[in-house]
Protein backbone atom coordinates (compact mmCIF):
# COMPACT_ATOMS: atom_id res chain seq x y z
CA UNK A 1 0.00 0.00 0.00
CA UNK A 2 2.74 2.46 0.98
CA UNK A 3 4.64 1.56 -2.19
CA UNK A 4 1.54 2.32 -4.28
CA UNK A 5 1.13 5.75 -2.68
CA UNK A 6 4.78 6.60 -3.35
CA UNK A 7 4.40 5.44 -6.95
CA UNK A 8 1.56 7.95 -7.43
CA UNK A 9 2.95 10.90 -5.47
CA UNK A 10 6.54 10.88 -6.71
CA UNK A 11 5.72 11.50 -10.41
CA UNK A 12 3.39 14.33 -9.39
CA UNK A 13 6.19 16.01 -7.42
CA UNK A 14 8.61 15.57 -10.30
CA UNK A 15 6.15 17.16 -12.73
CA UNK A 16 5.39 20.14 -10.48
CA UNK A 17 7.02 23.50 -11.38
CA UNK A 18 10.23 24.12 -9.51
CA UNK A 19 8.76 27.08 -7.63
CA UNK A 20 5.44 25.47 -6.79
CA UNK A 21 6.59 23.78 -3.61
CA UNK A 22 7.87 27.04 -2.19
CA UNK A 23 4.90 29.25 -2.99
CA UNK A 24 3.60 29.09 0.56
CA UNK A 25 6.97 29.87 2.12
CA UNK A 26 7.00 32.87 4.43
CA UNK A 27 8.56 36.05 2.99
CA UNK A 28 12.02 36.92 4.30
CA UNK A 29 12.27 38.91 7.51
CA UNK A 30 12.83 42.53 6.39
CA UNK A 31 15.28 43.06 9.24
CA UNK A 32 17.61 40.53 7.58
CA UNK A 33 17.91 42.52 4.34
CA UNK A 34 21.33 43.89 3.38
CA UNK A 35 19.89 47.27 2.37
CA UNK A 36 20.42 48.84 5.78
CA UNK A 37 22.38 51.29 7.89
CA UNK A 38 22.84 51.13 11.66
CA UNK A 39 24.51 53.23 14.31
CA UNK A 40 23.77 54.88 17.67
CA UNK A 41 21.27 52.18 18.57
CA UNK A 42 19.08 52.73 15.50
CA UNK A 43 18.79 50.32 12.57
CA UNK A 44 17.06 51.42 9.36
CA UNK A 45 16.22 48.87 6.65
CA UNK A 46 14.81 49.70 3.20
CA UNK A 47 12.82 47.26 1.05
CA UNK A 48 12.05 48.77 -2.38
CA UNK A 49 9.14 47.23 -4.26
CA UNK A 50 10.66 46.71 -7.71
CA UNK A 51 8.15 44.33 -9.30
CA UNK A 52 4.56 45.05 -10.29
CA UNK A 53 3.25 41.92 -8.59
CA UNK A 54 4.19 43.32 -5.16
CA UNK A 55 1.69 46.15 -5.58
CA UNK A 56 -1.34 44.33 -4.22
CA UNK A 57 -4.70 46.04 -4.59
CA UNK A 58 -5.46 44.95 -1.04
CA UNK A 59 -2.56 47.11 0.19
CA UNK A 60 -2.27 49.98 -2.29
CA UNK A 61 -5.75 50.16 -3.80
CA UNK A 62 -7.06 49.69 -7.31
CA UNK A 63 -5.14 52.52 -9.00
CA UNK A 64 -1.53 51.54 -9.65
CA UNK A 65 0.96 54.34 -9.09
CA UNK A 66 3.66 51.84 -10.13
CA UNK A 67 2.17 51.83 -13.64
CA UNK A 68 2.40 55.63 -13.52
CA UNK A 69 6.16 55.44 -12.89
CA UNK A 70 6.40 55.63 -9.10
CA UNK A 71 7.98 53.24 -6.62
CA UNK A 72 7.24 52.39 -2.98
CA UNK A 73 9.99 51.68 -0.45
CA UNK A 74 9.01 49.98 2.79
CA UNK A 75 11.28 51.40 5.50
CA UNK A 76 11.80 49.84 8.93
CA UNK A 77 13.17 51.75 11.92
CA UNK A 78 14.32 49.66 14.92
CA UNK A 79 15.11 51.88 17.88
CA UNK A 80 17.09 49.95 20.52
CA UNK A 81 17.60 53.02 22.70
CA UNK A 82 15.87 54.01 25.93
CA UNK A 83 14.94 57.35 24.38
CA UNK A 84 12.41 58.03 21.62
CA UNK A 85 13.78 59.53 18.42
CA UNK A 86 12.18 62.29 16.38
CA UNK A 87 12.34 61.88 12.60
CA UNK A 88 11.69 64.55 9.98
CA UNK A 89 10.18 62.61 7.02
CA UNK A 90 10.12 65.72 4.83
CA UNK A 91 13.92 65.73 4.61
CA UNK A 92 14.20 62.12 3.37
CA UNK A 93 15.54 61.87 -0.18
CA UNK A 94 16.29 59.19 -2.74
CA UNK A 95 19.62 60.12 -4.31
CA UNK A 96 19.99 58.49 -7.73
CA UNK A 97 23.15 58.40 -9.83
CA UNK A 98 22.79 55.94 -12.74
CA UNK A 99 25.81 55.61 -15.06
CA UNK A 100 25.97 58.41 -17.61
CA UNK A 101 23.30 60.50 -15.91
CA UNK A 102 23.40 63.48 -13.60
CA UNK A 103 22.73 62.87 -9.93
CA UNK A 104 19.14 63.50 -8.90
CA UNK A 105 17.75 64.09 -5.41
CA UNK A 106 14.13 62.95 -5.27
CA UNK A 107 11.89 64.07 -2.44
CA UNK A 108 9.52 61.75 -0.61
CA UNK A 109 6.04 62.14 -2.10
CA UNK A 110 2.94 62.57 0.02
CA UNK A 111 -0.10 60.35 -0.71
CA UNK A 112 -1.72 63.43 -2.26
CA UNK A 113 1.24 63.87 -4.62
CA UNK A 114 1.08 60.20 -5.59
CA UNK A 115 -2.65 60.41 -6.31
CA UNK A 116 -2.20 63.59 -8.37
CA UNK A 117 0.52 62.05 -10.51
CA UNK A 118 -1.44 58.82 -10.95
CA UNK A 119 -5.00 60.00 -11.52
CA UNK A 120 -4.73 63.50 -13.00
CA UNK A 121 -2.76 62.05 -15.93
CA UNK A 122 -4.84 58.87 -16.22
CA UNK A 123 -6.15 59.83 -19.65
CA UNK A 124 -2.73 60.71 -21.03
CA UNK A 125 0.14 58.50 -22.13
CA UNK A 126 1.96 57.85 -18.86
CA UNK A 127 4.93 56.44 -20.77
CA UNK A 128 5.76 59.82 -22.25
CA UNK A 129 9.02 61.08 -20.78
CA UNK A 130 8.51 63.97 -18.39
CA UNK A 131 10.92 66.19 -16.47
CA UNK A 132 12.93 64.20 -13.93
CA UNK A 133 12.27 64.77 -11.12
CA UNK A 134 8.65 65.42 -12.02
CA UNK A 135 7.58 68.87 -10.75
CA UNK A 136 4.92 69.14 -8.10
CA UNK A 137 1.44 69.61 -9.55
CA UNK A 138 -0.03 73.08 -9.17
CA UNK A 139 -3.65 74.17 -9.26
CA UNK A 140 -5.21 71.19 -11.00
CA UNK A 141 -8.81 70.07 -11.45
CA UNK A 142 -11.00 69.17 -8.50
CA UNK A 143 -10.42 65.92 -6.69
CA UNK A 144 -12.96 63.18 -7.30
CA UNK A 145 -14.01 60.07 -5.38
CA UNK A 146 -11.14 57.98 -6.80
CA UNK A 147 -8.61 60.57 -5.64
CA UNK A 148 -10.04 60.65 -2.11
CA UNK A 149 -10.14 56.85 -1.96
CA UNK A 150 -6.56 56.56 -3.18
CA UNK A 151 -5.15 59.13 -0.76
CA UNK A 152 -6.97 57.50 2.16
CA UNK A 153 -5.58 54.09 1.21
CA UNK A 154 -2.02 55.38 0.86
CA UNK A 155 -2.20 57.28 4.14
CA UNK A 156 -2.99 53.94 5.74
CA UNK A 157 0.31 52.38 4.61
CA UNK A 158 2.63 55.41 4.34
CA UNK A 159 5.14 56.25 7.04
CA UNK A 160 2.73 58.21 9.19
CA UNK A 161 4.73 59.20 12.26
CA UNK A 162 7.72 61.33 13.15
CA UNK A 163 8.29 59.56 16.49
CA UNK A 164 10.29 56.32 16.78
CA UNK A 165 9.42 54.79 20.18
CA UNK A 166 12.17 53.22 22.31
CA UNK A 167 12.76 49.47 22.02
CA UNK A 168 10.31 49.18 19.15
CA UNK A 169 10.21 48.77 15.38
CA UNK A 170 8.26 51.25 13.26
CA UNK A 171 7.70 50.92 9.52
CA UNK A 172 5.83 52.50 6.64
CA UNK A 173 6.11 53.24 2.93
CA UNK A 174 7.90 56.12 1.23
CA UNK A 175 7.00 57.02 -2.36
CA UNK A 176 9.27 58.34 -5.11
CA UNK A 177 8.66 59.26 -8.75
CA UNK A 178 11.14 57.26 -10.86
CA UNK A 179 9.57 58.30 -14.17
CA UNK A 180 9.37 54.56 -15.02
CA UNK A 181 13.14 54.14 -14.66
CA UNK A 182 12.88 51.52 -11.92
CA UNK A 183 16.36 50.21 -12.69
CA UNK A 184 17.73 53.48 -11.31
CA UNK A 185 16.76 52.32 -7.82
CA UNK A 186 19.81 50.05 -7.83
CA UNK A 187 22.00 53.10 -8.38
CA UNK A 188 20.41 54.95 -5.49
CA UNK A 189 20.89 55.71 -1.81
CA UNK A 190 18.09 56.44 0.62
CA UNK A 191 19.28 59.49 2.54
CA UNK A 192 17.77 60.13 6.00
CA UNK A 193 19.49 63.16 7.54
CA UNK A 194 17.29 64.57 10.28
CA UNK A 195 16.91 62.46 13.44
CA UNK A 196 17.16 63.64 17.05
CA UNK A 197 17.00 61.97 20.46
CA UNK A 198 14.00 63.51 22.18
CA UNK A 199 15.34 63.35 25.75
CA UNK A 200 18.54 65.37 25.30
CA UNK A 201 17.91 66.90 21.82
CA UNK A 202 21.14 65.33 20.56
CA UNK A 203 21.19 64.84 16.79
CA UNK A 204 22.04 61.47 15.27
CA UNK A 205 24.45 61.16 12.39
CA UNK A 206 22.71 60.85 9.03
CA UNK A 207 21.73 57.47 7.61
CA UNK A 208 22.51 56.48 4.03
CA UNK A 209 21.23 53.16 2.69
CA UNK A 210 22.76 51.76 -0.49
CA UNK A 211 20.01 50.07 -2.53
CA UNK A 212 22.36 48.26 -4.92
CA UNK A 213 21.75 44.96 -3.12
CA UNK A 214 17.97 45.26 -2.97
CA UNK A 215 16.21 41.94 -3.69
CA UNK A 216 14.81 41.59 -7.21
CA UNK A 217 11.20 41.54 -6.11
What is the predicted function of each stretch?
Residues 1-4:
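Positively charged n-region of N-terminal signal peptides that target proteins for export
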Residues 7-17:
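Bacterial N-terminal signal peptides
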Residues 22-217:
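Conserved functional micro-motifs across diverse proteins
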Amino acid sequence: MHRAILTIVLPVLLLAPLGALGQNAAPPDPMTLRTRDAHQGLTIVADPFLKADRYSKDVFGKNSFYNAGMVAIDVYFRNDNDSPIRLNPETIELVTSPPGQDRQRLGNLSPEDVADRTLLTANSNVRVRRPFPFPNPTNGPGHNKDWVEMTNTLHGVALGTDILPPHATTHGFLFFDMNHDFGAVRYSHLFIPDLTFMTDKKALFFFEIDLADAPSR
